[in-house]
Amino acid sequence: MTLDEVTCGMAVRVGMIEEKEVRVQALRLGLMEGELVMCTANVWAGAIVLEHGGQEVAIGRKLAERIRVWPVWHSRGER
């Protein structure tokens, strides 16, 4: 799954980011491969807001579409 597909309350682990330009942009936002992040908002046709390291960061949808993630858990008890 990709980052743009996560739902609010979902925790995911950032997967391998193959494209160099995407990896650089993600690093600028503090996202590294293997990092655990929580989605706090997924605005339809807008940004995905993530919480990690005690901070919130908004990721543009175009960038989020290019970052693969692995679901860890959901605040509603889903896996």
What residues fall within each predicted segment?
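Compact, glycine-rich, soluble single-domain proteins
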Residues: 1-79
